[in-house]
Amino acid sequence: MKILVIGPSWVGDMMMSQSLYRTLKAAEPDAVIDVMAPAWCRPLLSRMPEVNEALAMPLGHGALELGERRRLGKALRSKGYDRAYVLPNSFKSALVPFFADIKTRTGWRGEMRYGLLNDLRVLDKAAWPLMVERYVALAYDKQRFTRASQLPQPLLWPKLQVSEQEKLTTAARFGLAAERPVIGFCPGAEFGPAKRWPHYHYAALAQLLIDDGYQIALFGSAKDKETGEQILETLQPHSREHCRNLAGETQLEQAVIMLAHCRAVISNDSGLMHIAAALDRPLVALYGPSSPDFTPPLSDKARVIRLITGYHKVRKGEAEEGYHQSLIDITPARVITELNTLLGENQEDACRS
């Protein structure tokens, strides 16, 4: 069985999609699964043992480019795929498998993709509340499985592979001290400060952890570098040597390895949060206006802190510097209590194993 998956274009969604690959591979161990996704996804896909090959999608996120998609599809015919799974909901994402003449093309209806998909699923959001459940459902017969509660349990959550040698080599390359365990902070989030725990709370937490013998690694893209600098500048001067701002300094590949090296991770609702969960790191996930009811961190070692309910489509908070009040109200003391509980549980698990 040869399978082509048209993968998502967001870090968090790409991570959650691994649950589908794991489910397909568990059902058919000899299945060959290729994933077509933006080239930046390769560092994630290469660490998913279920994926045979990461195929770069050369077209931009919003580009239709019908002729190029036809060319791509026809070029894939020689690979002889038996099935395709289309994870994005867009019309254009279903074109390549259609032009590749793949016999069975599975996906949710999305943008009215009748004809393009011939194993079409109509989404009942109440029956399939979690994104990961919607992905996994595609592996099963739509007549037999009509709601998430019918899926075999437990779901196979995302699980990335990183070697111990990679962790040590990469940590040394970025100047992390071997004698202090690392706590990772992911202080960024898409769409502005409303989804971010305030930098001054991160700084207060960092100070507590540094005083307790840890070092801090700040992760994120180049646009998160300023937030990292704000955290650093708020620390006591003698503590700054134990906090490393890696935002914008690491490629995604290196960030994955470094997150795997962390003793634990504190994160806003972001793609890096989902990566940390897939690396099985003790994780405290901080939510405000966005909701964990749809895309929670998929890990037994994750704890979510959220002080409000429901989903609030807010890109800029009402408080100073654009933060959301519900995130301001999460105190560093609450976070460190949750973190210490997680670290204690993780230590007990390590002793038992």
Predicted regions and their residues:
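Catalytic machinery of carbohydrate-active enzymes
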Residues: 1-353
